[in-house]
């Protein structure tokens, strides 16, 4: 595995209950890069992330760099509203895991929460009382609080108000520039892919294209992904194919 390579995937496939959910996926991600994964619903995007994290059995080879800390923000995170766990207690579970002194960790946490638009007041609120958008911000903060080298985001702006979406994507850029974080991102927004991704991986149960967005996202590729008559945005222009 090359020194600058964070992730090397070769001929990855996922078969569950006799059904092939993903096949023929190969790509590499280098340190500090942003890879966007796109495709229609049911294309295997989330399944790929679960395979990368070892949450589902897979065929082929998935190699991570040694000793990497990995943060993961799922698209959905069910919360039992009856569990009396505050945001502070939720994060202190992670402090125990990484052996941070509680007070030092909470000082650091306040800064990380501010990056996702949450104030210190949220620390005393029960997790089950947070709105969908607040919970999504909380999960982003949870994933990045221990400064992982790699972060996986499954549609990070799902459930977040439109006004905060740009803040999230600017945050991802900031993590890249200031912490050299490697970003893997599932998105349905092609305008975001063009603006923020170094690489794009196109899935529809198999790998249809992979490379720099401007090099591989041609109308015929998007038709194969999303079907005839679909709309997509490319920079400031709207195209139909």
Annotate each PLM feature.
Residues 126-130:
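Conserved ABC ATPase signature
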Residues 215-241:
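ABC ATPase nucleotide-binding domains
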């Amino acid at each position: 595995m090359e020194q600058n390579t964070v992730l090397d995937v070769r001929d990855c496939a996922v078969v569950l209950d006799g059904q092939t959910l993903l096949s023929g996926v190969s790509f590499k991600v280098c340190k500090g890069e942003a890879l966007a994964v796109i495709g229609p619903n049911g294309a295997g995007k989330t399944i790929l992330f679960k395979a990368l994290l070892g949450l589902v059995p897979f065929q082929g080879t998935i190699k991570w760099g040694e000793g990497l800390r990995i943060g993961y923000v799922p698209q959905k995170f069910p919360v039992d509203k009856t569990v009396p766990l505050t945001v502070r207690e939720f994060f202190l579970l992670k402090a125990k895991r990484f052996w941070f002194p509680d007070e030092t960790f909470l000082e650091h946490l306040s800064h990380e929460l501010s990056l996702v638009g949450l104030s210190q007041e949220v620390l005393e609120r029960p997790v089950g009382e947070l709105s969908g958008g607040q919970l999504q911000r909380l999960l982003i903060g949870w994933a990045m609080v221990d400064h992982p080298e790699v972060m996986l985001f499954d549609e990070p702006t799902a459930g977040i108000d439109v006004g905060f979406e740009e803040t999230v994507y600017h945050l991802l850029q900031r993590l890249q520039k200031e912490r050299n974080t490697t970003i893997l991102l599932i998105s349905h927004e092609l305008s975001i892919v063009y603006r923020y991704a170094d690489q794009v991986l196109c899935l529809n149960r198999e790998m249809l294209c992979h490379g720099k967005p401007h090099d591989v996202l041609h109308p015929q590729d998007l038709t194969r992904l999303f079907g005839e008559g679909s709309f997509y945005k490319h920079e400031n222009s709207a195209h139909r194919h």
